[in-house]
């Protein structure tokens, strides 16, 4: 079964910390790929400074396999909700194992996210601490 990591964020801008997390999770958990998913409009903070096109270009220029750019939230438009993205990706990749990658700070706020209880039903969550320790829960 193909294992896909899902790593969302504003990526405004993408930086070495983002790339390091994605690569280390891919290596440590033997993922086939990690999809970097830039949000269109975060539900919990202000609009990114860089435009969607600029952020897509920055990400595209910064990554290589096994990292993959996925513009689903930007293409969908409006406010980005993780649960909507997970529902779409579960339908798009029904035979794959999806693992959502979160920083520990985001994990602790997860209960406040839109339809948080559904997120736990749709995916396993990989929590990465600030020092890049990888933990699958």
Question: Model features per residue range: what roles?
Answer:
Residues 1-137:
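Nucleotidyltransferase catalytic core that binds NTPs
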